[in-house]
Design a protein with these regions (language model features):
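N-terminal leader/targeting segments and the immediate start of mature chains
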Residues: 2-74, 79, 234-237, 241-243, ...
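One face of beta-strands
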Residues: 54-62, 67-88, 93-97, 102-106, ...
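Short, basic/low-complexity N-terminal boundary segments at the transition from targeting/disordered tails
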Residues: 75-82, 140-156
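A mid-sequence, solvent-exposed acidic-amphipathic segment
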Residues: 150-191
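Gly/Pro-enriched, hydrophobic low-complexity segments
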Residues: 174-241
């Protein structure tokens, strides 16, 4: 659900023209009078603690190099799902990912199967819009469904310090405190991230913004994730008919384990 992680890992969207971002300076507001950096750290830690292992609905969008990625999904206790759309260079890729227990499932159009999963053009045409299954213990394919269980949500929200306060805002009708941190790209550079939590009440995240000052230009990623329905636990059903993805992908694409 994190835009940067979705682009560099989960959706393998480098093939769609979205690459690792470079650092963009972020102008931040001064902390409230009398507040120290440790206070921002404390609020960030309180937000992760409040999340715990709660389910949630999320919507995210990211842009870079003229490519866009839109994702919507739900994380539950034993199952979860997300649907994504990648648009780049006149090509639209659509894919749905689902996890039920210890098995992951993906279904996508031919473009998504070829560019995001790595199937051949012939395989992508044959298996387009059908369900492909794999064990979540598979190192590599597991990223396709990472963050879709409620026990994984807090980890998806992790950002690095030092933490500072940004400018307070009204987000989704709520007065919110902005906590600024960063995440690292694959190249080792850092991208600023702003996490918005309610100013009062339980600090369950409302929104997360990556590179708030960027506009999805040639070298800078910009993304947002919004959260709602904290505590939900939607149950996803396993598809009735599937094909093993492990039998289709090149052996070098992942570390194969039993199952799938």
């Amino acid at each position: 659900m994190h835009p940067l992680r979705q682009i560099t890992a989960r959706t393998a969207a480098v093939a769609a023209g979205i690459t690792a971002a470079t650092t963009l300076a972020l102008v931040t507001a001064a902390p409230p009078a009398g507040a120290a950096t440790t206070s921002a750290t404390g609020e960030y830690n309180a937000a992760l603690k409040a999340v715990g292992s709660q389910g949630v609905h999320f919507d995210s969008t990211a842009q870079q190099n003229g490519a866009t990625l839109d994702v919507t999904g739900d994380a539950g206790s034993t199952s979860g799902s997300q649907s994504l759309v990648v648009k780049s260079n006149g090509i639209t890729e659509r894919m749905t990912a689902r996890v039920v227990g210890k098995t992951g499932y993906v279904s996508g159009n031919a473009a998504a199967l070829q560019h995001e999963i790595g199937l051949t053009k012939a395989q992508s045409s044959k298996y387009a819009n059908t369900w492909l299954s794999f064990p979540t213990s598979n190192n590599g394919l597991d990223e396709l469904v990472g963050g879709l269980l409620s026990s994984e949500v807090a980890k998806e929200l992790e950002i690095g310090g030092p933490y500072t306060y940004g400018k307070a805002a009204t987000v989704a009708g709520q007065k919110a405190t902005a906590i600024i941190g960063s995440v690292a790209t694959q190249s080792g550079s850092k991208v600023p991230v702003v996490l918005y939590v309610p100013t009062s009440g339980k600090p369950l995240p409302i929104k997360e913004v990556t590179n708030a000052g960027a506009a999805g230009g040639a070298s800078a990623i910009q993304g947002t994730v919004t959260f709602s329905n904290w505590g939900e636990d939607k149950s996803q059903a396993a598809p009735s008919k599937t094909t093993s993805l492990l039998k289709l992908i090149p052996a070098s694409s992942s570390t194969t384990t039993t199952g799938g």
